């Protein structure tokens, strides 16, 4: 119970550090017909940026965790994109497969945002994501280090649903 409470406090502190990004969503979002697929790892500040925008746009998406040392989904990214770089987004609705958080964010607003334009708050990210990095550190840098306890854990039989942000 204490571990869970600590994670809740970490998540809140991380969200507040980022100026509240990732804590609200768009009403009546433009949902894609097929779920978007995001290959990412939790500790990456660049992946964090994409997750914040997916939350803001209130989009349903599938997350494929690719922590350091993980073998399950990293090979798919390498096969499809040619390199191990994260985040990696696949949108089967448009046939797009892409790297680079800034490009992904612009793409998401263009195709699924209300105006089709990336708001200034999300287009003017600094090159080095200091604030997002602080959020990663507050959250214990999960996904940055190899966790031997979970490295070969089997995937669940069906996708898990997360409600919240």
Describe each model-derived feature in a short phrase.
Residues 1-165:
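GST-like domain detector, emphasizing the conserved glutathione-binding G-site
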